[in-house]
Every structure is written in structure tokens, then in C-alpha cells.
Amino acid sequence: MTVELSPRATELAEHARQLLAAGGYNGFSYADLSEKVGIGKASIHHHFPSKADLVLTVVRRHRQQSAAGLAAMQQHIGDDPQAQLSAYVDYWARCIRDGSSTMCICAMLAAEAPMIPPEIAAEVRGYFQDLSEWLAAVISQGQAKAQFKPEAAAPVEALALMSTVHGAMLTARALGDPEAFQTIVRAAIHRLAV
């Protein structure tokens, strides 16, 4: 299902995404969003009756954008699994370095899973399932092409790499060192290739 939004709702969703990446579900309110966008809370409620509606929309958009981004990257790079993994982690390295997105919103929301509405938690799980399946497919292709020699089955390696990528985001944030992300994830990819 594609999420279609008006220009104002798109603007609200994008600012909400930034607030989610910075502080998670409980880290912002409609008052914060109102201040950031420069409209009243009533106008926000017109587009998104509740915070849960807003965040669910943001997560669905993130999921769609991620899937489209991975597909476009694969099409651009071609059939080179190692280059695909490198491009994936390089994307996040750039986002962390330039500050445009220092943390995946789904990672932030996953940490809050017991406290967020179930429909949002389900969408977050879907994001991680999608990503894990993509990573497993890339790792399997890399194994078939003798680019990777994983120690475990591709789905297990995918979960490990996914956990490493999101943990590296957290580490880079905690240390205040964007380069820590790249160092950690490059080591993980190197272990696959050895």
C-alpha cells in the first residue's frame, strides 16, 4: 500500500521523521512539531488525528522508501552482492556523517516497542523483516558467487549484520563519533568476505 499525502501532510511526516530519529516516539509531541513546522496543533490534527496515526504513516513511508531505495541501488549497482552491502552501509555512513539521519527511526521505535501502539510495533517488525530478507538474499548471492564465506546460514548472518548496522548507529551516537559507524560495519562485512 503506497502512502499518498498532501504537500502539508508530507511536510509534517518528514519533520516527524526527524523528531523520531532524534528522540523516538515519546521524545516529541504535537507541540514540538507545531513549533518546527510553524502551524497550530489543530492543523496537525486535521492531517493526523492522533500521534499514532502520524507515526504509523511515517513508518509506512520509511518502509516504502527503504524498499524503493534498495531496489534502485540494486538496479544501479547490478549483480555484485559485496558492492550492494557496501552501498547500503555507505548510505547510512553518509547520513550519520552529515547529520541528516543519525539513527534509523525503526531502530528507535524498536527500542520503545513495549510502549508504542501495537500497529506501529507491527509495522516496525515488518521493516526489520523486509531488511533481513533483503540482506539474506544478498548474502546468499554473495556466497553463490564466492564473495562471501558466511559462518552461519544466510538468514542468521543477515540478522547479525542487521543488528550490527543498527548497533553501530547507536555506538556512533553514544560516542559522538560518526566514523565509529563505518569502522564497525566494515569489520562486519569483512568477516563475511573472509
PLM features: what roles do these ranges have?
Residues 82-83, 122-126, 144-160, 179:
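All-alpha amphipathic helical-bundle segments outside canonical DNA-binding/catalytic cores
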Residues 83-84, 98-119:
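Amphipathic alpha-helical segments used for helix-helix packing
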Residues 2, 83, 87-94, 129-141, ...:
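C-terminal peripheral helix-coil segments that are non-catalytic and often amphipathic
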Residues 107, 152-171, 187:
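Hydrophobic alpha-helical segments that form the core
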Residues 5, 11, 15-57:
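Helix-turn-helix
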Residues 55, 59, 63, 121-132:
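Amphipathic, non-transmembrane alpha-helical scaffold segments
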Residues 57, 61, 71-102, 154-161:
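Hydrophobic alpha-helical connector segments
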